[in-house]
């Protein structure tokens, strides 16, 4: 999703009900929930566009486990979320990172940004996903920066990059399997290299990949790692592999797609004095952190039984916004209003 149509406003410093740190699916849906609860809000997003990982890493990936969508492209889901939230005109600050916060004597919060702006709100919600993320690389390849973006990729942002190409995909998780099948109709040839003896991704997709292998449509090399690359300038020529048994093979290739995961880093949020567990923020059943009035939702929130999927993040956002309203208006009975009733009133 580009920021076209997004009301990306400059820092105003005006007091709003809720500041949302993070503009991924959870953060966008939290903004919608604010509108549903007649709350003003702002989103602070460090990237130049909303959508989080869906926009930055997987805009053309298809998603199948979001309610009511049999199949939806990641960028399309972000667009739909923004269409839903945008009707309430939330303030959106792009290309700026929340670096610290201060809780004032009156219970409100001030968030300070990397650009030197200050944002004040009555409550605070962190929906920053996994934090900052960098792709895992293969150290044995050395400096490959000259190949990145031309023949070496860590995600698929445009299928066209691989059309008619001989593609080697490294990995055995969900992303590797999804893109093996996703690029199969476009690429001249797809070869999968995986260091383990079996795939770790979703069973259904794994079977599809193995069936394609049986049909001779793709090659799969288990117990094998990439040992080195043969290149010419910024162009990849061959991928040299070595199996655990010592067998070496040279694969002609135009593109190398490393889908072996990302390293996440909470960044400045890790220094905010919140209770953390496994690089995530501990919350209670109201999505409240160890600081009263400060909430967390989505992948960055940790609680027993948590599943890090989009659907859960949307639920987290709903809970967090709802309970933040109780913090903002202590002692006031918060009544639930069905969306159909609210929308009918808005249309009058």
Curated annotation (Swiss-Prot):
Annotated FAD binding sites: 26, 45, 53, 58, 98, 133, 299, 340
Cofactor binding annotation: Binds 1 FAD per subunit.
Record's keyword terms, sorted: FAD, Flavoprotein, NADP, Oxidoreductase
Transmembrane feature ranges: none
Alphabetized SUPFAM superfamilies for the sequence: FAD/NAD(P)-binding domain
Enzyme Commission (EC) number: 1.18.1.2
GO molecular function: ferredoxin-NADP+ reductase activity; flavin adenine dinucleotide binding; NADP binding
Quaternary context: Homodimer.
Similarity remark: Belongs to the ferredoxin--NADP reductase type 2 family.
Name the record gives this protein: Ferredoxin--NADP reductase
Phylogenetic lineage: Bacteria, Pseudomonadati, Chlorobiota, Chlorobiia, Chlorobiales
